[in-house]
């Protein structure tokens, strides 16, 4: 059980993060090294893996970090459970763009975990999520957009949702989504499950 005053404090923090998100075109075609980060759980332990992959060769290396997670799962506050472990898992990895398993600005306070990590690290991030957290889906010119309060905050390709975290824009998300679910996140997901079993 999380006290109401703590959630209100965290909401204020999220609004501050959202104000510091930079939306600008990055250019997916310029990415040579891409990173992905994911997490799996066993009891109250979180197993986070960061993967750095060479776009051209497909070669990758990874780092893992295991830590205790005491904050409960509350929709909209995922960053409190996962961001600390994810940040530790990507420390020192070589990459130009970070893909985070979770939302960016397609979030009720425009401050999903990809936005939080992107702002804290001052780094280009895109959130790639398996379910919609907020907003309405609208089809335009063969692309499904996520609208929040009249603003486009994300796109849906297949069953996945892509939204800017920091230092990227919606066009970057579209270009990424058109390529299918990112291989670097598939690898990160596979490794978290493998490490969790060890």
UniProtKB/Swiss-Prot annotation:
Question: Primary place of residence?
Answer: cytoplasm
Q: Name one GO biological process term.
A: DNA repair
- For the site labelled Interaction with target DNA, the residues are 73
> Reaction catalysed by this chain?
Endonucleolytic cleavage at apurinic or apyrimidinic sites to products with a 5'-phosphate
* Molecular function (Gene Ontology), one example: single-stranded RNA binding
Q: Where in the cell is it found?
A: Cytoplasm
Q: Which UniProt keywords apply?
A: Cytoplasm, DNA damage, DNA repair, Endonuclease, Hydrolase, Magnesium, Metal-binding, Nuclease
Q: Report any Pfam family annotated for this entry.
A: Endonuclease_5
EC assignment: the record states 3.1.21.7
Q: What class of enzyme is it?
A: hydrolase
Query: What are the cysteine partners in each disulfide bond?
Result: none
Quote the function comment for this protein: DNA repair enzyme involved in the repair of deaminated bases. Selectively cleaves double-stranded DNA at the second phosphodiester bond 3' to a deoxyinosine leaving behind the intact lesion on the nicked DNA.
Lineage top rank: taxon: Archaea
Q: Name one GO cellular component term.
A: cytoplasm
Name-wise, this protein is Endonuclease V
Q: Name the gene for this chain.
A: nfi
* CC cofactor: Mg(2+)
Q: Which residues bind Mg(2+)?
A: 38, 101
Q: What's the family?
A: Belongs to the endonuclease V family.
């Amino acid at each position: 059980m999380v006290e109401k005053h703590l959630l209100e404090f965290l909401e204020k923090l999220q609004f501050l993060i959202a104000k510091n998100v930079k939306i600008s075109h990055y250019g997916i075609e310029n990415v040579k090294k891409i990173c992905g980060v994911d997490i799996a759980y066993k009891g109250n332990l979180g197993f986070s893996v960061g993967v750095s992959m060479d776009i051209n060769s497909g070669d990758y290396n990874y780092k893992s970090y295991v830590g205790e997670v005491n904050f409960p799962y509350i929709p909209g506050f995922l960053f409190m459970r996962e961001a600390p472990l994810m940040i530790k898992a990507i420390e020192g990895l070589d990459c130009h763009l970070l893909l985070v398993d979770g939302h960016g600005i397609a979030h009720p306070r425009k401050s999903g975990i990809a936005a939080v990590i992107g702002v804290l690290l001052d780094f280009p991030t895109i959130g790639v999520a398996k379910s919609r957290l907020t907003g309405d889906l609208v089809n335009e010119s063969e692309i499904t957009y996520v609208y929040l309060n009249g603003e486009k905050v994300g796109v849906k390709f297949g069953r996945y949702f892509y939204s800017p975290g920091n230092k990227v824009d919606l066009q970057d998300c579209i270009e990424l989504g058109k390529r299918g679910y990112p291989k670097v996140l598939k690898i990160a997901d596979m490794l978290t499950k493998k490490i969790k079993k060890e």
